[in-house]
Amino acid sequence: MRGARGAWDFLFVLLLLLLVQTGSSQPSVSPGELSLPSIHPAKSELIVSVGDEIRLLCTDPGFVKWTFEILGQLSEKTNPEWITEKAEATNTGNYTCTNKGGLSSSIYVFVRDPEKLFLIDLPLYGKEENDTLVRCPLTDPEVTNYSLTGCEGKPLPKDLTFVADPKAGITIRNVKREYHRLCLHCSANQKGKSMLSKKFTLKVRAAIKAVPVVSVSKTSYLLREGEEFAVTCLIKDVSSSVDSMWIKENSQQSKAQTKKNSWHQGDFSYLRQERLTISSARVNDSGVFMCYANNTFGSANVTTTLEVVDKGFINIFPMMNTTVFVNDGENVDLVVEYEAYPKPEHRQWIYMNRTSTDKWDDYPKSENESNIRYVNELHLTRLKGTEGGTYTFHVSNSDVNSSVTFNVNVNTKPEILTHDRLVNGMLQCVAAGFPEPTIDWYFCPGTEQRCSVPVGPVDVQIQNSSVSPFGKLVVYSTIDDSTFKHNGTVECRAYNDVGKSSASFNFAFKGNNKEQIHAHTLFTPLLIGFVIAAGLMCIFVMILTYKYLQKPMYEVQWKVVEEINGNNYVYIDPTQLPYDHKWEFPRNRLSFGKTLGAGAFGKVVEATAYGLIKSDAAMTVAVKMLKPSAHLTEREALMSELKVLSYLGNHMNIVNLLGACTIGGPTLVITEYCCYGDLLNFLRRKRDSFICSKQEDHAEVALYKNLLHSKESSCNDSTNEYMDMKPGVSYVVPTKAADKRRSARIGSYIERDVTPAIMEDDELALDLEDLLSFSYQVAKGMAFLASKNCIHRDLAARNILLTHGRITKICDFGLARDIKNDSNYVVKGNARLPVKWMAPESIFNCVYTFESDVWSYGIFLWELFSLGSSPYPGMPVDSKFYKMIKEGFRMLSPEHAPAEMYDIMKTCWDADPLKRPTFKQIVQLIEKQISESTNHIYSNLANCSPHRENPAVDHSVRINSVGSSASSTQPLLVHEDV
């Protein structure tokens, strides 16, 4: 073998010398005479085994170089001979010899390697609606069934087609968007054995089929000189290849600066924010700014208008005639619209330049953020004749002030002031009214109540009642009694456009003199009938009022205790609690969605709040509001709920207040949104998937440690007053089923700008550890309420909400619960009460205390461990029920309750309120039942919350709440956080 190889080497050297001699002796070849180089061995393909030698010879008078190419990688040599002593699989590829004329010849070499059938080039990208090459060329062309296979035995999409080439790889035809993240292998059969390449994950770049979507934060801006102009353009497209810019129309010069920020949202959505700012705007910066974006499909643009003024302004537009006439007892609204920039700071109505009135509403003309036009309405109700005059609206901002005046004239029916004086033979009638009344005289013989024969007056005088031009006008009319020759009655009638009135004077002749017989104001049968009708109407209204008061009335459930006198609790009137206007939130930044709950007078609506946390962030919230059918009582009750929530402050296990809208429209109370609804229905949904055993997962502790470490900076630096519970991503791979359930919950507390690929809490099973966690969290929340001297009075599973991470939050649906149609609320007196959840002292003596809340908590535990069953099953609330409660009847242990938890229930149901545990003691008892990891989790989450928990106040130690003769009057308004 060695001798044969030596012979070949000798022949090769001899041939090489010959070529050199030939090349040196022959004249140069012209380009037109060039021919293709020749390669030895003269084959298109060469197959060698791994470890063998590759020896290739290129013969050409004008030889330049060898080029080796595989998987897009090139290497070159300038020798005529290419020698690879020990071939490897990576030497598989195309070898090309190129001469000076650019002509070339190629040979493809396969280096057969049993251990490496495929050469791989990663990653794999493809453009939608184009072909893409899976680079997995073979090292052995003699294999069979060279194709693509899905990972883990999964089938490829039915519409996926491909073409295989052993030298290049496999080309996928017409890539579709649905192929994105498709996992596949190159496969082939080698000597009867199926071989797979490393896995490829296809990443599809979307085809551009539409122009970019462009929007701006605001479509118009109004600024004063020196203020900052900042507008953000949002461009949405399928890829980052989109171009964008800001352009000021009709101008090439601008002091504006731009800043770009971009990110991918999902697989086929790319977003870019292009922010344009002018740090100090000037009048000549006014104009139209266009955000322009284009891609290969086309272009799109959107504009925003900037108007810069040298100083602020106020322009007032009365929406009615400024001279107003209104009848006595009627209502009128004085309406003005005004434009103001900056925003108005002061608004006021002045009556007769002396006194102010607050019966007005002021609100933006439009919900648009760019709105500078406002509406102000002064409501004048049941105006009296003395309330006519000038009403002036004043408005001001930091730069200017302006005003407009309305002249209000009250039309009044004439009033007869004097009619029964007979002086020096003259009879005088004096009447006052507006407009000026007209007085007519009538005479009839005898004593009559109404006369019809007209008599002309002797003298008529008109004068104003006061200096003010808005008062009544007084008219004097005089008649000579010599006109009358017989006994009779003289009637004075005064009338104007509003109405009329009359009076009569009866006289008789005695000798030659006339003397007054009787003077009276007309008292007609019509007036008598009116009085009777009015009396009947009053009786009817009184009956309706009585019936209304007998109906169950709504009242705020949560009560804040001020002090205790023996058995009597003195509550703070919630209407007297302060309301801090820092909670105000612009109602035009709320976008309402579906209704979450509704009662007779109120409802809770899902909404999106823009700018509640950050100026450019959206957050899902719950908004409590009144229905149009609500009365004054319900309006006051909703405001009381708002004040109680703002007084309590924030805690992880109550539904926290986020904001409110109390100005310029109906009251709106904005609270945290709990996506999984109330705990009662959650438990009932989970009955079929409940896992009875209690599982300890020590890996969970490490999982939460990692979670909390990742959030440490955000916990310490956060300025929010609540937790933003949006879904996130868990970075720990669970190893067991319980781990999987726990990690999904944890993921909901991690804040990232990516879409989480985790299971939702609502899809996970329920186990005993969850029930213990719920009972523990509710006890913590109730301990917090107790520390704030707040009594809940309606603690039940239906009033516990559930959010991400299976965090429970205590709430009071209040106006938004339809208690009229809820069988849990029973009519007792003039109220509907949750009797089955109430302590005996509350049922029979109407006493609500911290201890009665503990009783209700025991009923809640029974609901919890029965997975949402109704308490006292099969027992209607009737006299028998009340008798059994008095005699000490208590429910048996629910099906899934551990013995220790049933012991807690029984202590909560002690007949003596003073022997019931406090919520602080209940928390300590349950801590012994829950797993160490769950306790550690809750503690860390509570510490991570912006509102950390301090030790709860133990009310049984601080005060003797119920039935103690030793308890004296003690103030409870001490501010302690839990």
From Swiss-Prot:
Annotated site location: Important for interaction with phosphotyrosine-binding proteins: 938
GO biological process: actin cytoskeleton organization; cell chemotaxis; cytokine-mediated signaling pathway; detection of mechanical stimulus involved in sensory perception of sound; digestive tract development; embryonic hemopoiesis; erythrocyte differentiation; erythropoietin-mediated signaling pathway
Gene Ontology molecular functions: ATP binding; cytokine binding; growth factor binding; metal ion binding; transmembrane receptor protein tyrosine kinase activity
Modifications the protein undergoes after translation, according to the UniProt entry: Ubiquitinated by SOCS6. KIT is rapidly ubiquitinated after autophosphorylation induced by KITLG/SCF binding, leading to internalization and degradation.
Topology, Cytoplasmic side: 547-978
Binding-site list for Mg(2+): 569, 799, 812
Residue(s) carrying Phosphotyrosine: 548, 554, 569, 571, 704, 722, 731, 825, 902, 938
Pfam families per the UniProt record, alphabetical: ig, PK_Tyr_Ser-Thr
Entry's family note: Belongs to the protein kinase superfamily. Tyr protein kinase family. CSF-1/PDGF receptor subfamily.
Note: Numerous proteins are phosphorylated in response to KIT signaling, but it is not evident to determine which are directly phosphorylated by KIT under in vivo conditions.
Function: Tyrosine-protein kinase that acts as a cell-surface receptor for the cytokine KITLG/SCF and plays an essential role in the regulation of cell survival and proliferation, hematopoiesis, stem cell maintenance, gametogenesis, mast cell development, migration and function, and in melanogenesis. In response to KITLG/SCF binding, KIT can activate several signaling pathways. Phosphorylates PIK3R1, PLCG1, SH2B2/APS and CBL. Activates the AKT1 signaling pathway by phosphorylation of PIK3R1, the regulatory subunit of phosphatidylinositol 3-kinase.
Assembly notes: Monomer in the absence of bound KITLG/SCF. Homodimer in the presence of bound KITLG/SCF, forming a heterotetramer with two KITLG/SCF molecules. Interacts (via phosphorylated tyrosine residues) with the adapter proteins GRB2 and GRB7 (via SH2 domain), and SH2B2/APS. Interacts (via C-terminus) with MPDZ (via the tenth PDZ domain). Interacts (via phosphorylated tyrosine residues) with PIK3R1 and PIK3CD. Interacts (via phosphorylated tyrosine) with CRK (isoform Crk-II), FYN, SHC1 and MATK/CHK (via SH2 domain). Interacts with LYN and FES/FPS.
Protein name: Mast/stem cell growth factor receptor Kit
Organism from which the protein derives: Capra hircus
